[in-house]
Amino acid sequence: MKDINIILTRHGRYNNSRDKSDLSIGHITEEGKREIAEKTKKRIDRIVGNKLKDTTFLIIASPTYWLSDERFGRRAIETEKVTKAEIMEELKQEGLSEEEAKSHFYLKPEIYTRQKTNGVSIEELRDKLAEPNVYDLAPSYIEKLKVRYGGMNSGFWKELASSEEVKQYNKDAEGPTDLRRKITELLNYVVEWSKDYSKSQDTNVCIFLITHGETMEPFIQNRKLSHITEFGYNEGIVFNVKEDGIIIKTEDELFIGPPPKVKDGYILGRD
């Protein structure tokens, strides 16, 4: 079986000001761009290694605008662009032309699986990585948590990722169970697609899923995969897909998941 790795990661450093008179808010900063490029290079070196020319890349990022306002930045989409640019540079350093490097990215608008023979659109998959709608649909709950914890600190984020109290404010607001389900469904789709695609095209596959800390943390906490309660900028975990299971690792390759070769359904499954 060829190598298949899925990197679930938070977006990079951005201008998190809420001053709506500043149109640079929500955009990845120059420091953030450098950090993303450096992190991507390290990831490629560690995860892909000398198999770069025999690897197909798929990058899917959250479509969310900062403050849900189209005037401002889309930090996950911008992280995707920097990530892709760095991978392109790595490929060209291997002697590939611009067009040859581009051919190493899966760019079709859908992926196809046995579950979804008509295809699942990349846009639908992007939506599963979106920032939780709690900020728009239950702002009073967010304000209550801020008061309870004295701001948006570690206690705030831990409760946001684990409590279903938000449903008391708006039943349509996404709670931890909703977010876990979205990430689970996304992972199930891309795992199945990557296995089929890798086999049919005889290629290694490396997938970047770029999202928000609030979206990925409920999945991690519920599966008891690690001590992580909060992800820093561009931090994430790696799913190493095997024929008979999935191994999950942190960025520094400390093992945090169930024992190797655990069946897919145990780690992913459906809530």
Task: Specify the residue positions occupied by each region the protein language model found.
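Active-site-proximal alpha-helix that buttresses catalytic centers in soluble enzyme cores
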Residues: 1-117, 166-177, 181, 226-252, ...
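Active-site-proximal flexible loops/turns
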Residues: 18, 78, 123, 128-131, ...
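Active-site-adjacent alpha-helix immediately C-terminal to a catalytic or transition-state-stabilizing loop
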Residues: 20, 181-249
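Low-complexity, serine/threonine/proline-enriched polar segments
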Residues: 96-174
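Acidic, His/Gly-rich catalytic cores of divalent-metal-dependent hydrolytic chemistry
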Residues: 254-271
